[in-house]
Structure formats: structure tokens, C-alpha cells
């Protein structure tokens, strides 16, 4: 084990030097294989493709190898751990300096004659053919690793890899006899006598018979027959199998470019686009393999070969490839190192075809960064990490530099491959549909197939002649510009290759070939012919120079002066030299022939590229026409969507402006709110949204009828959701009157529950007609009062009936005896039913209308009330009088509510309710939660009057409640605090005040207030003075939650209304806070308009925006505010931020601040919370729009 670890560390160090070759079945570092050649010699011509069905060829190959194997034992050859290995001649060998290149060629050149060492130097342009190393007697030559090498018949070019075999310089390690590995690989080169002037090379992989038992031999035979039956363009073609007394031999196709691992070691990392192209081809081949019930189980870069035209071929399947019916000892066996193996195989668990999906991920990582996962660990450590379910492959196996090489789509693709559980891992068909493959294969898939078919095959070692067509359909790319640039690059490469060929002269220079002659006459005749040749090709000025050159390069030989033995030796030397020259001339002619063949290839590639561009233009024309139709359709759909959006906005506006008369209308509004998918965070702080029990309907809690829901608050709406994930509310309650909110508690046998009772008053539309505010009938009904009338829904219509149209009434009045109806005319009310409470109707003449046409003046009750008021004014102070008025009103509200409940039980079907109250009960387990919710609900309900088209109580009762303590200026029209109109006389008060509620600062527009201040002031003076006082007392406990004395708040309000300056030094901070909230609630206009509120909610709920983008959008939104509104919002948020900073930061502090000021300023809670947290960034110094 220590030796293996030491060897692996050595392999890893060599990998860092870019000498790493991914291992084969064993998973170890690979070295060049022992290469044995079986050759026969002949003059090579242009080879052609071999028919796949040529059985004679297979027999010749097998017979040739059998002859070799009979004479040579496989034991004498060193074993290697790779199935197939060969060294490829790179451009670096042929780009050496002239001297080194000449030395390299001399090293590779075989001896041409016995005394070749004494021969003259040859030209540097001469190249050599592999036929020089072939035996002339057609004998089989065995070439060991250090004995002989062969030269490529083609000079390597930048466009393709050659099949040259160079002498290996690496060591060969002994490998243990492991099943699934080959002892050696031999190359069979067949020539004329087999293939009719064609040279083809076939690799044969040999396995020693002593290493495998009889069971394994049968398995190998059966599986080879299965592999031989596979016919696919992405799988290596297996030709035959040799089985004799020495062992097994497998004959397959030969590919001169080698494996992807060899290419990585030669050229470096692959580009992602090229990896995607190869991955697509491999997945298509694996899809075919899996459809045949076969699992590869040994997929890695060393087992993927590259053919001409960029086509990859899968080879070297692991033993036990069948999905079933395999012996367990083989099926669950481990092949080599675990770096490429899936967790289920390493755990020896049952596996399926998804083990190849794991190997695909390892292969992609290997092609891009040069190593599989966990290659920096030892084998056992890597096995543990792969099996460990908590360990992730990405990005643990990559450093920071390597992670930058992987795109986002590729990372997603690899995550699907590296799922530890096979059920979660993507199959081959799932990976084929991944967008990462379509990114790089859309535009190149169709072109690559056409170009590969159009290229002529100069030397084809691919026996699979018919290339199967792509299983995928034709892909089209709309990126015409990238196609155009790619075509230009390819054409420039082809033309540059053509220029290089043109620069190489195809004519043979005879001056390089020096032949010796026998006598002087022949030499002179040769000189004469040679001079004529030069005169025809050169200028006349160079004639003498050429003669001198020729004279210097030749020598006169006089054989008569020598002895006979010397003449014989001299003639032998001349013959040897002339033979050498003849060989050089032959090689030069072969090189010229090869250059012409390459030129022919370039012409054919130009032709195929022209056809490809033509097809691209046709496709582009079709796509352009289709794009135009799609563009028209898209524009039409955009216009339709625009119109629908405008209709939707108008409907939303109509729904907002519509008078809501029933609770189902409130649900419609909730639907509009949640149609924009507003989250809970933008609705309200999460601390104000909780699970609770509620009931709707009765004002009393009924056991067993409660519902559990998730409640949250939005403006004046209380939404109930089934759970936190629900997107549509199940119930909606509208809060429109603070008098309808009360608290109570109930006690049962188990525990005590705290109840909040909320009443929503819904009125008839005719009673809220704003056009008849001055002369309409005023209703002083309580929240639960019911008005019973005839079939006429409007009480005003019943009061305007003619006096002569009197009907008989059968009424049983069990209601309040103090109900007063006053009218100016002799109007009779018509009713059929049991009237329990009739709303009082005020008429100036002070007469009472009774049933049965009897009209009497009511003097005694009024006189008694006036006397009581006078006595009370004399005995008690004004403050006590106000308190008693409040108590009386509360008692009347309770009586009216009781009367309304009894009236609801006694109503007939013919009676119409002009107003009704919907009750909602919220139940809490403890008083603290109840108090928190009660405070929030109390702050949400507005104190100001609603407009006529909003859900609201009638205007008069609310004004009475708000201004009943204000004395009327009309002394002749005094009324009791409990009577209609209150102490203030609302009608006369409105006339004298001109319709303005407050004459001072409360209830006045901010723009009007700022006109009274200096131009440089940001806030009104009284407001800035109030905020400075509160900032000094911000540490006061409960400054936002607790409310000060209502009497003190009212006194400070009256001082402000009179224009007096208030000294807040000795004032209660809680009362000053209440005054501040009162001022903000009474503002006639909202600080943030409705459309800006909607925009802010959409910005904050948009998940695509980051923090900076949201701040930028909010700044743009706030810039639309006027200067007074912007300053008020800025200073109020600064004060709220100061409260949060001075307190111990927690969710409850910011929740209290939000619930205090967000409803008061009428700003969405989510926006308020966001502005507090980002105050410094949201309020920079910039010019605001006026």
C-alpha cells in the first residue's frame, strides 16, 4: 500500500508538469505502451476507406497476428497498464532549428547503404516515408520499445494530427495481473498483398491466457460478440477476436489522433465549447449503448478516441457490461483507481446505467482542468470522500482559478452528474436536454456533420464506412453575426494553408541530387545538357556562374589510370552514392505528391465550406421570414397586453372609488391587493401577523364555531389567511369606526380567553349621497342601529311623501321612548312591521311626527333637558361636564346596540336595512397579545371624516363625537350634549368656519402651513419645536406605546388652534407624542400618494432587485414628492430611527415604531421599515422636484 501511495505521489508530481496521462482500466498513471508492428512493405499510394463487411481483411489480420504470436511469447514483453498507447508527432518536432531538425532526421533515418555514414549531407527539405522501415522480403518485423520507430507518412499540419510514432522516452512500469487490462498492444500495418495498394493500421490488444480463468474467457467471448454487434458512429468498431494457445487478442479500429487524454497532454486544456461538442456526441453514443442494455462503466478521457472531422469514439468497455445476468464477482468488481467511479459502484451496491452519468462529469472536469475529482488525495481517501454522502464534488475539488473556467450552465450540468444518490442523478436522456449543450451545439451541429462528410479521406483507418446521422434534429441559430465571423476564420485558415502550399515549389530542383559518372565524355555531355537547362530557366547573365557551379559540384573521373581493383571499388562507391541520390529523389517526389494531395484536400474543404455557407444562407432566409412573422405577432400581443393592463388599472381605480356596501366588496378589494403578490413583509411587520382564533357574525363568542387563521393588517383591512403560505384571504374585515372596537374576556372550565370585538358598519348608498349633505336627512344611528322602513330603501323618500297619502299602520313600538322625529312639513312615516328603534330626524320647526297622523309639540322633554344642563353648568366644571357627556353617549350606544340586535330578530322579509354591522371577534390566550393588537387596531382606525364614497359612518355622528365639547358660536341654537348635533351645533359650526374643520394648524394642508413660514424653513415652527422636545425625551419609556392624558392633549391642541406658542418643558412627553400623532392623522392629504404607495410596494416585493437597486428606485420615487411632504417624511423617519437607535435593537422595538407612525403617516409598513434601516442612503442631498 505504501508503494502504491508513493507511486501515486510521483504520478501527481508528473501531472503538475503536464506529463499526466489519464489512466485506463487500472486508473494508474499511464506510460507509452509497448508497440509491436507487423508490417509488409510496398510503395504507398493514396489510401481509401475500407469496407466494414470485408471478412477477408479480418481473416488476414488474424492470420498475421497468429503467426506472430506462435513465434513470440507474450510473457517476454513487458506489461503495460493501458490498452492502447502511441506517441504522436507534434509540431514542436518539425519546428526545430535546421541543425536540430537535421540531427533529428538523421536519428530517425534508417541506413540506406553499408557506408552511408560517409555519404554527403542531404537537403533539409527531404522527408521520409514509413516504407523505409518495412522489410523488403515481406517478413514480419517485431519492433520493441527501444529498437525501432516509424515516421509519419504525412507531415503534421496545424489543422490535423498525424499518426507518426516517435521513440518513447518514458519508463514502463510493471503492472499487477488485474482483470480488464491488456498485456500489450501491437499495430498491424497491412499493405499491397492484402488491400490492393492501400496502407491501413489496426491495433490489436492482447491478454495473457494465464491471467484469466475459463469463466472469464467465456465472458470475454460473449461480451466481445455483443460489442461487435454495436453499430454506431460514436463507438469504436470491433473487427475480430483472436483466441489461441497464447491468449486473447481484440482487433479494433485505429485512430491516428489518439485519445482525448493524449490531445490534452499535447495541446493543453480544451475550450468549453469544444467540450460541449464532444459531450453531446458521447451522450448520443451512450444513449444508444444504454438502449441495448449495456453499461460502459469505464468512461474516461483515455477511453475516448478522436477521429478525423472532430468525431469522438468510445472504446474500452469494462468487463461485465451487461446490465443483468453477469456473475456478481465480475459485475461488482472495481477497476483501478476510484477517481472516475460512481459511489454505488465503490460501495459494491447494485447499479444501473446512471454510473455512466457520473463518469461523464468526471470526463468533463478532466478535459477542462486536467484531473478528475479528488485527484489530489490518495486512492483510499478519494474513495472515502466519494462514498461520503455529505461531501460535494463542486466546488470542493476545484481551486479558485479552476472554478473560473466553469460557466454557470456547466456547473448546473455537473451538479446533475454528481448526485450521490442514483435516483437523484440525471440520466443520459436528461443530460441531452440540458441547455448547456444547446448553447454551443445549436449553430455547429448541422455544419459539423456536413463538413465531416464532405472532407475527402486521404488515409482512412475507419472501417465503419457509413457514418450514422445525428439522432438530434436540425438546430438553427439566430446569431448570424457569430456564424459569419466563424466562417471568415475557417476560410482564412484554409487560405493560409493554401498559401503555404503554393510557396512550396512542386518542381524538383535537380541541383540537390548529385550523380557521379563513369568517364569524361559522359560528364561533358551531362554538363552540356545541364547548361542548356539552366539557360532556359535563368537569365543569360547567370550562365557563367551556373557553369562554374556545375563544374565545382562535379568531378572528372579517369578510370583508365586506376588499377582494376581500384576501379571496382570506385564503381561501387559511385553506385552507392547514386542509389542514395535516387532514394532522395524518390522521397522528394513522394513529398510533392503528398503536398498535391493536401492541396486537393483544401480545395475539397473550400467546396464543402461553400456549400455549408449556402445552406446557412438558406436557413437564415427561412429564419428571417419566420422571425418577421414572430415579430409581428409579438408586437400584436404587446399591444393587447398594454390594452389589458390599461383596462386592469381602470378597473382597479373604479374598484377603489366604488362605494362598498357589503363585505363581499371588501373581499374584491383584497383580491386586487393580493393580485400583485404582495408579501407579508410589505403588508406589515411579521410581529403584527400571528395565528389566532376568530369568529364572524355574532357579537358573542360561540364555542365550537371559531376558526383558526393567520391574521395580518393592511391599511384598514384585517386579512385572515388559512396559513402563512396562502396567497388569497379567506375572510376580510374593514375597520371604519373606533367606537366599534372593544375588549372583553371569557372564562371557561379550562382557561381564560381575551376577546377583541370589531364592528364594521355598512350603510346604504342612498344615505351617503354627497350631493344632499346640506339638506339631507341626518341619521344619528349607532354602529349597530337598524332602520326599518317600507319597501322604499331610502328614508328620505319616505319623508318626502305627500301628506294626503296616509296609510293605516299596525305598529307595536317596543323601543326607546326618547326617540324623536322632527319635521318641517306634515310628513307621515309608513311602516309595516315591528319598529323597535326609529332613527331621529332633525327638522328646524321643532315639531314631532307621531304615528296615526297626530302631531304634538315636544316641550316637556326639552325643557327638562335644558334645566338639567343649566344646573349642571352651575354645579360642575367644564371638564366634568365633558366626561359626563361621554358616558351618556356610551350608554346610548349600548342601548341602541341592544335595540338593533332585538330588531334584527323581529324583522320581516319586507323590511330593508339601511345600515348593518358585521362583527368579528378575535381570541387571544394572554392579555399581552390582546393589548398589542388592540393598540394597533386603535391606531389604524382614522379619526378624521371619511369621504362620501368610502366605507364610513355617517358624517354627522362622527363630527358630534369629535367636536361635541366645542361650544357653538350660535347662542340661540344651544342643544344638550346628548341631543342631536352635540354641543357644537354642527350645521351652524360648518357655516361659520367655511367648511374647514380647524381654524389653526390642525387639519390644514402642509403647503398652506409652509406659506406662513420663512422660505428656508423645512418644517412648520410648531412642528420642529415639538420634534426637538421629543428628541430630548426619546429615552422616555413607552413614548410611542403609551398615550398621555386626553385633557392635556386637547388643551395643547386648542392652544395651537389659537396660534399660541407652547412651552413643552414641563409637558408630559407621552401627551406631546399623542399631539404629534393627532396632527399627522388630521392632515387632509396623504404624504405619499396612492400611486407611489403601489409603486413602492412593487419595488420592495420584487425579488430580482438587490439592496442597492431598491434604494435607487426608492430615491427616484421619493423625488416625485413636493418639498413640504418630503421634509416631513424625512424628519419623521429620522425621529423614528433615533428611537430605534437609542433602544436595544430587537424586532419588537422596530415593530412598535412601525405600528405607531406607519398608519399615522399612511405609508406602507414595509416601506417605512425599509426607510428606517436605509435612512442614510435613501435620503441623500439632491434637488427635489417642486
Curated annotation (Swiss-Prot):
Residues 1-12 have a biased composition (Acidic residues). The lineage of its organism: Eukaryota, Amoebozoa, Evosea, Eumycetozoa, Dictyostelia. The keyword Coiled coil applies. CDD domains: RhoGAP. This is Probable inactive serine/threonine-protein kinase DDB_G0293184. One of its GO terms (biological process) is intracellular signal transduction. Residues 847-896 have a biased composition (Basic and acidic residues). Residues 173-437 form the Protein kinase domain. The keyword ATP-binding applies.
